[in-house]
From Swiss-Prot:
Probable 2-oxoglutarate-dependent dioxygenase that may be involved in glucosinolates biosynthesis. May play a role in the production of aliphatic glucosinolates. Binds 1 Fe(2+) ion per subunit. This is Probable 2-oxoglutarate-dependent dioxygenase AOP1. Fe cation binds at H186, D188, H243. It is an enzyme of class 1 (oxidoreductase). Disulfide bonds: none annotated. Its cofactor is Fe(2+). PANTHER family: 2-OXOGLUTARATE (2OG) AND FE(II)-DEPENDENT OXYGENASE SUPERFAMILY PROTEIN-RELATED. It comes from Arabidopsis thaliana. Residues 158-262 form the Fe2OG dioxygenase domain. Belongs to the iron/ascorbate-dependent oxidoreductase family.
Amino acid sequence: PSVSFQLPVIDFSDQNLKPGSSKWDEVTADVLKALEDYGCFEASFDKLSVELNRSVFEAMEDLFELPIPTKQRNVSSKLFHGYLCHNLYESLGINDANVLEKVNDFTQQLWPDHGNKSISETIHLFSEQLVELDLMVRRMIMESFGIEKYIDEHLNSTYYLTRLMKYTSPPDDDDDEETKLGLRSHTDKNIITILHQYQVDGLEVKTKDDKWIKVKPSQDSVLVMVGDSLCALLNGRLHSPYHRVIMTGKKTRYSTGLFSIPKTGVIIDSPEELVDKEHPRIFKPFEYTDFLHFFQTEAGR
């Protein structure tokens, strides 16, 4: 069973939120505490206006209404990056959606004749705003652990995947708990994930003491979550929380995710500043694609 619970809410809307300011230090302390306690927090961020959220929601409705063969043209050479469909879950993926040209490539896959200018612009603007939040959070985390000298190198070592997700409600006559699982319990493998859900709740996060909590962010806020690669980079100083999606009721659930992901060839290794007698090295250095492939094998499950 899960319980409703309010995760820490941290406001990133202040105009004075610049590195080095007292406001920055205050928010950084809140971010660190929330991530140490839960591995995630709710961020309120006024750049996600009501209009922008509505445009993204409408874009998702239009995209998912396309025929399956059309959606299957959303392909990528990267593992798990294109169109995915499993039970109640369906998803489209756009690499580097903070670059307008890349979003145009995505809409061109689905509408080869003319793309879709308004959907491209909406997804690009939305991704751009979330990237800004991702960069702030990662800078704060690195400052908190005294490894700010690696900030630029770290921020340049990643790229972004924007994922649009649709969860269909389970059939009426189905009481099987398993089928209500929109997405099974998992940790994210990347650096940071920023999730936004539209109108229908369903996301649950596991706490350190193994309790499932229902996460109900307000419409103008997002959930910021630590991924396994960040946990490894920080030598286990933060943890990546298990989370899942439970579908109850009759409404279709839409959500978006922005994932910061290590670029191909980047080796994830804890800086020596985070390794000492009390904190011996926990993870062998690894390359992200190898890590993903490992989780695809029996040993990794």
